[in-house]
Amino acid sequence: MRILQALKKYTKFVEQFTNQSQTESKIEAEHIFMFVLNVNRPKLYEQFNNTLTNYNNKKIEDILELRKNKPLSYILKKHTFYKDEFYINDNVLIPRPETESIIDEVIRQGDLLFKEKQKCIFLDAGTGSGCVGITIANQRPEWKVLLLELYSEAIEVAKINLKLCKKNNIDLIRSDWLKPIANNSFDF
């Protein structure tokens, strides 16, 4: 079977068991194919006329079987948030799309309140994967970002994402919410 035919077939399959729109199902199926074939979207499209190997077809079917009971981000161990890819596992929550608008608002408010040369300090309490704080740090490298998390499993996920982002304006602290930082001040 050609990759394009398989993609259409599995898009319908995703649509049936997730109750997503056809567009959402196609995007999800494309993510599965990109993961299995280890390609980006343009490369996937270039390969539409290639034959899908039995091995890769089986891998796709295995992922789809898991997908019946588990979000795709947990299966693939990654999630795109605000144009960046983050490591995710079931020890942290999957970032929601509407959280991206919070990022936009924090940046907008921060830009209004602080000049370029001033340092803004952003606290991400209960950071989980760290995607919110890391995204802020990526968008505003002149700001200081503090990630706060209590659970060691989530801290491990945040550490992986910190290594991937390679920013020096972020600190990660294991803490029971605000106890050790009570005497500090934060802008957001």
Label each residue range with its predicted role:
Residues M1-H79:
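N-terminal auxiliary segments of SAM/dcSAM-dependent transferases
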Residues K59-R140, V145-I160, R174, K179:
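SAM-dependent Rossmann-like transferase core, predominantly class I methyltransferases
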